[in-house]
C-alpha cells in the first residue's frame, strides 16, 4: 500500500468516502431520499443560508446509491461538496443526465451548467471530470444569458490558480486547456462583451496587474487555434488587446501578424497597434511595429516622434 501522511482510513483522511470500511458508518440515506420525495427545495434556505440538500452534501462522508431526479442536483453537489467523492459524483451524473444542460442561478449568483461550475473550481477540475460531464450530455459550449454568454472555457479562463502564493504567480493548467480543445470547445464563440476565449484570456491575465510570462505558452496556443474566428472578433482587434494589456512577447505578435488579411495599421476603437504601444511607452513594441510597416503618420493627438528615440 502507498504511504501517506495519514492512514487512508483515519478520521481526517483525504481519501474519506472511497472505501467501504469508511462508509460503513454513513448516514441513513433513507432520510435524505425522504426529504427529496417530500419536496425539499434546493433554494429554500435556513438561518444559516443552507438548503436541506446542501446540508447533506457538506457532510464529511457520502454514500448515495440512488437519488431522486432533481433539476439542479449535480450543480448543487459541485457547489457544496465538502470532501469530493468521485464514485458518488459519477453515480450522480449517470442518474441525472437530463439536468446537465440546466442553468443554475440563485439570486444574483450565476453558476451555469455543471461544467461551468466545475470550470470555476480550479482546485477540483480535471480532464476526467470534464469528460464524465461532456460524454453524458453536458454541452462543452453551453452558454446563455444566465452566464453572461460565457462558455465553460470562458469560465475557466476568467480566474487564475495561485501556483506560488509567496510570489503571487498565477497560471492556467495546460492539460485542462487541451482537454477543452479535445472535447470540442469552440474557440470562436464570444461572450456578451464580444470576447472570444483567447481575447478573454488576454484581458483576464492582465486584470490584476500580473505579468503574462507564466501563461504566454497558453496564449500562443489559443492564438494559433483561433484563426477561424470572425475577423471583427479576432483579427481586427487582437493585437490592440494584446498590447493594451501590457504583453510584450514578440512571438505572439508574429502569430497575429500571420493572420490572413491582417493590417498592421488597422484601427480598433480609434487606435492602431502603434498608438497602443506608444500609450504604454513600449518602445520595443513600437520599434517592432515600425520595422514591419506601421505608419508613423497616423491621425492621433499623440506626437509619436516624441516617444520614439
Swiss-Prot record:
One protein family per Pfam: Ank
List, alphabetically, the InterPro entries matched: Ankyrin_rpt, Ankyrin_rpt-contain_sf, Multifunctional_regulatory
List, alphabetically, the Gene3D superfamilies matched.
Ankyrin repeat-containing domain
Q: Which UniProt keywords apply?
A: ANK repeat, Repeat
Q: Which domain of life is it from?
A: Viruses
Keyword set includes Lipid metabolism:
no
Which regions does the record annotate with the repeat ANK?
13-44, 110-142, 160-189, 197-231, 269-298
Miscellaneous note, as given in the UniProt record, is: Corresponds to the C-terminal part of Kelch repeat and BTB domain-containing protein 2 in cowpoxvirus.
Q: Return the similarity comment.
A: Belongs to the orthopoxviruses VACWR203 protein family.
What name does the UniProt record give this protein?
Ankyrin repeat protein VACWR203
* Source species taxonomy: Viruses, Varidnaviria, Bamfordvirae, Nucleocytoviricota, Pokkesviricetes
Amino acid at each position: 500500500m502507498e504511504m501517506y501522511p495519514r492512514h487512508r482510513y483515519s478520521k481526517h483522511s483525504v481519501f474519506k468516502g472511497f472505501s467501504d470500511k469508511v462508509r460503513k458508518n454513513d448516514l441513513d440515506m433513507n432520510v435524505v431520499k425522504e426529504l427529496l420525495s417530500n419536496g425539499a427545495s434546493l433554494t429554500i434556505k435556513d438561518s444559516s443560508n443552507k438548503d436541506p440538500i446542501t446540508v447533506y452534501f457538506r457532510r464529511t462522508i457520502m454514500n448515495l446509491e440512488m437519488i431522486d431526479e432533481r433539476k439542479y442536483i449535480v450543480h448543487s453537489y459541485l457547489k457544496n461538496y465538502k470532501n469530493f467523492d468521485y464514485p458518488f459524483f459519477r453515480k450522480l451524473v449517470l442518474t441525472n443526465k437530463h439536468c446537465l444542460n440546466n442553468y443554475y442561478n440563485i439570486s444574483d449568483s450565476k453558476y451555469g451548467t455543471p461544467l461551468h461550475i466545475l470550470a470555476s473550481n480550479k482546485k477540483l477540475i480535471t480532464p476526467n471530470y470534464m469528460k464524465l460531464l461532456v460524454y453524458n450530455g453536458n454541452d462543452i459550449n453551453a452558454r446563455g444569458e444566465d452566464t453572461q454568454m460565457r462558455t465553460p472555457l470562458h469560465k475557466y479562463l476568467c480566474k487564475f490558480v495561485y501556483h506560488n502564493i509567496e510570489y503571487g504567480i498565477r497560471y492556467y493548467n495546460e492539460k485542462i486547456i487541451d482537454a477543452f480543445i479535445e472535447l470540442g470547445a469552440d474557440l470562436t464563440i464570444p461572450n456578451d462583451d464580444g470576447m472570444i476565449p483567447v481575447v478573454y484570456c488576454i484581458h483576464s491575465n492582465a486584470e490584476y496587474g500580473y505579468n503574462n510570462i507564466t501563461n504566454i505558452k497558453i496564449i500562443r496556443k489559443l492564438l494559433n487555434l483561433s484563426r477561424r474566428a470572425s475577423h471583427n472578433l479576432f483579427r481586427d482587434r487582437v493585437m490592440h488587446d494584446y498590447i493594451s494589456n501590457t504583453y510584450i512577447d514578440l512571438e505572439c505578435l508574429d502569430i497575429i501578424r500571420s493572420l490572413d488579411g491582417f493590417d498592421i495599421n488597422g484601427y480598433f476603437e480609434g487606435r492602431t497597434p502603434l498608438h497602443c504601444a506608444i500609450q504604454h511607452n513600449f518602445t520595443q513594441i513600437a520599434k517592432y511595429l515600425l520595422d514591419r510597416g506601421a505608419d508613423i503618420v497616423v491621425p492621433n493627438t499623440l506626437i509619436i516622434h516624441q516617444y520614439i528615440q
